[in-house]
């Protein structure tokens, strides 16, 4: 079975979602199905069919989260000695060599990536170029819009 890296924050978010789905949503859907059943003929009961469909989606999401958690390797970057090298979970400030524009990214697991929040997937072109490099290094990133050079300004374990 393939294991996937996940940050502590990513694991916590999945656990919270799983708890919400199993403790709040699942019981409410069961209650909704019971209430809809009482309305009569199930063949033409839109409320019943909608609740059953939603129940199926919730159960699929629960299975998905449980599978992800089972195959996750949770990495707490704050427990790893700071060497100045970029590793999974670190937060990296980089500057475009040509424009001097800087940006900060945290390198996270595939499921945690959210570019709007500054979280990039470990499998993204930028992250792949940054991994194992050090502060002061210049990396070349091949993107759909062309080749960009970035200098690593700072690596933080937060």
Swiss-Prot record:
<dbReference type="InterPro" id="IPR028624">
    <property type="entry name" value="Tscrpt_elong_fac_GreA/B"/>
</dbReference>
<dbReference type="GO" id="GO:0003677">
    <property type="term" value="F:DNA binding"/>
</dbReference>
<keyword id="KW-0805">Transcription regulation</keyword>
<dbReference type="GO" id="GO:0032784">
    <property type="term" value="P:regulation of DNA-templated transcription elongation"/>
</dbReference>
<dbReference type="GO" id="GO:0070063">
    <property type="term" value="F:RNA polymerase binding"/>
</dbReference>
<dbReference type="Pfam" id="PF01272">
    <property type="entry name" value="GreA_GreB"/>
</dbReference>
<dbReference type="GO" id="GO:0006354">
    <property type="term" value="P:DNA-templated transcription elongation"/>
</dbReference>
<dbReference type="InterPro" id="IPR036805">
    <property type="entry name" value="Tscrpt_elong_fac_GreA/B_N_sf"/>
</dbReference>
<dbReference type="InterPro" id="IPR018151">
    <property type="entry name" value="TF_GreA/GreB_CS"/>
</dbReference>
<dbReference type="InterPro" id="IPR023459">
    <property type="entry name" value="Tscrpt_elong_fac_GreA/B_fam"/>
</dbReference>
<keyword id="KW-0238">DNA-binding</keyword>
<dbReference type="Pfam" id="PF03449">
    <property type="entry name" value="GreA_GreB_N"/>
</dbReference>
<comment type="function">
    <text>Necessary for efficient RNA polymerase transcription elongation past template-encoded arresting sites. The arresting sites in DNA have the property of trapping a certain fraction of elongating RNA polymerases that pass through, resulting in locked ternary complexes. Cleavage of the nascent transcript by cleavage factors such as GreA or GreB allows the resumption of elongation from the new 3'terminus. GreA releases sequences of 2 to 3 nucleotides.</text>
</comment>
<keyword id="KW-0804">Transcription</keyword>
<dbReference type="InterPro" id="IPR006359">
    <property type="entry name" value="Tscrpt_elong_fac_GreA"/>
</dbReference>
<dbReference type="InterPro" id="IPR001437">
    <property type="entry name" value="Tscrpt_elong_fac_GreA/B_C"/>
</dbReference>
<comment type="similarity">
    <text>Belongs to the GreA/GreB family.</text>
</comment>
<dbReference type="InterPro" id="IPR022691">
    <property type="entry name" value="Tscrpt_elong_fac_GreA/B_N"/>
</dbReference>
<dbReference type="InterPro" id="IPR036953">
    <property type="entry name" value="GreA/GreB_C_sf"/>
</dbReference>
<protein>
    <recommendedName>
        <fullName>Transcription elongation factor GreA</fullName>
    </recommendedName>
</protein>
